[in-house]
Each structure stands twice: as C-alpha cells, then as structure tokens.
Amino acid sequence: GVDSGVVLKKAIDVLGVNNVKPVVVKSELFRNEEFYQAIELVRSLGVEVLETEMAELEDDNIVKNTPESWYFSKRLLYGKLNEIKEEFNFNYILDGMIMDDLEDFRPGLKARDEFGVRSVLQEAHLYKSEIRELSKQHDLPVWNKTALCSLASRIPYGETLSLSLIHISER
C-alpha cells in the first residue's frame, strides 16, 4: 500500500537495495490482487522481493473472529517476519503503521510491540495525507491508492471465518 511503499522507498534510499529485504505476504484474508500489486511495486523499485504465505484460517484464535483475532493475526504475521529477519540476519522489521492508525482499535499493536517491530512512519509522526504527498513526490504508483483492509473486517464479530465466507465478503 501507500504507507509500506513509502517505508520501502525511504529504506532503499537510506540503506541501499542490498540492505533491505521487502517481504510480501500472501494472505487468505486479503485480495490476491493486493499481493500481486505489492510485488509489482517492490520490483519497480529495483529490489529483490521475498514472497511468503500465511494460513490464518488454520489458527482457531483467528477463525473465532473476535476483536482479539486481530492480535493473533498480527502475531502470526510478525512471527513469520521475525523468522525471515533472523534467517537473513537483519536488525529490524519495519511496518507501515501511521499516526492515523492510533485513532482506531488496534489489538495488533500488542503483537507489534512483542516482536519489536518498528513503525517508522509513526515514529516520524506522519499522517496519511503526508504519506500520500511523500509517495507522490517519489513517483510511487500507489500514491493515490485507496486504503486496503482485511476481508475479515467485513464479517461481523462472532461469525466463524471460513474461506467461503471470505470469498463472499470479497464481492
């Protein structure tokens, strides 16, 4: 998305292409097109992309679809990213969380903190409008992309998540 794209662009500018390892995660809870667009963006920046997958619907804590399911989903994500970080001997995991995200209910922040993930855009006190402007200045094709959300967010809490229900919510 816009936020992660700016994080990646700035990381490449500061650290160089050989010192960043962008990871694009294919998730059952997001549209496939989001995965492929993210890969395209990374490649357009001239850096090697690492593709991986998550199987959220195999985790009962996520499938239960409670407000805390977001924590378990992020914990699964950050756990996978932490394994990759260790494999490649990198120091940090960076995400695209922004100041606007602090205004919402975000149980995933607990998982972020547990894994020591850096939200560098929040650390810089940047909001969505500023991120879009930075993205536009750097000619990133995602500068005006609409915010994406998990398909599970369209399903009421308490309704058990399944692949068929996720596909219905995608329509």
Please describe what each predicted stretch is.
Residues 164-171:
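Residue-level detector of conserved catalytic or cofactor/ligand-binding positions
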Residues 136-156:
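Histidine/lysine/aspartate-rich catalytic loop segments that bind and position anionic ligands
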Residues 1-137:
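ATP-dependent adenylation/nucleotidyltransferase module used to activate substrates
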Residues 155-163:
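C-terminal scaffold of the Radical SAM
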